[in-house]
Amino acid sequence: MNRLKQAMSAVLLTCVVAFPAGARELPRPFPVPQTVSPELRELIAKVPPPHWDTHPGTAQEWKTWADAFSKEAAKTLPGLREKLKVGVAKGELGGVPVFTFTPKDLPEANRDRVLLNLHGGGYVLGQGESGTQEAVLMAGIGKFRVIYADYRMAPEFPYPAAVDDAMTVYRELLKTKPAQKIGVFGTSTGGGLSLILGLRAKAEGLPLPAAIAAGTPWTDLTKTGDSYFTNEGMDNILVSYDGWLGDAARLYAGGHDLKDPMLSPVFGDMSGFPPTLLTSGTRDLFLSNTARMHLKLREAGVPADLIVFEGMSHAQYHMAEDAPETRFHFSELGRFFDAHLQ
């Protein structure tokens, strides 16, 4: 079992210890498809995490859960960086903590380009180093320098803290290089936040990044969209909106309208957006979030492509670094950004 799969198992166990699972039962079982790699089949075959129906009731309970997640998730990251030959430097931009990940074999063509990574975690999980696995994989496989923004999160810092911090880092990057040399990417919450950054930059009159890659983006924080229902229980990562996920949406929103485009970018005006690449899976709870955003972008005349992985639940493309699907995903992101960044 590789490092990321070990980390995910440890994280799920820790979360179970921190908060007992609810009593809800999941729907029917599903066969594991034989049309995917053995590594992905192993992920698909896993039972859903028992903590999916956890409902922390206080800020301290949310913090306990987040801290447990961070502690376990961070354990394997030094080994992953070593395996992929990725260096790391800690710092800050505009007062926001950042990690800079640089592949040892950074191509000459990418030396003056940079990607901004916004991590997932429902606006409550993934603080510090614990959320950096996607950034490491992108640096190591996609061969770009990646700036990871450690943005503030709920419950201590609800909306608009996350997007404010993302914008602060983006503005700082614009001071060092033109937007045509900057790409933005993220998964889940980070995918949604990448799109929100584009909306916010447009509203502020800032140049938009050269390209955006939004993996299984959380584009609608309300329980709207077919796959919230059809993939409930089929997705063995998020499982259901009615677990901790819906609580996290309301916690971060802090009483604001969940359909505000600064929370749910699928309701925003996407005209003028840069080329955008979206990714999902056939079992992903956020498949409709992704498909709806793809259509919204295309309707606005934006060059937008959509990749849907067979059998994949939410964001499983960065949970097994040796899976062919993972290698394809991050190589494809590298090709996408190479095509659109100057």
Range-by-range predicted roles:
Residues F19-A23:
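Sec/Tat signal peptide C-region and signal peptidase I cleavage site
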Residues M1-R3:
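N-terminal secretory signal peptides that target proteins for export/translocation
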Residues S9-A18:
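Bacterial N-terminal signal peptides
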Residues P27, P31-Q60, T64, T76, ...:
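Alpha/beta-hydrolase superfamily serine-hydrolase fold, recognizing
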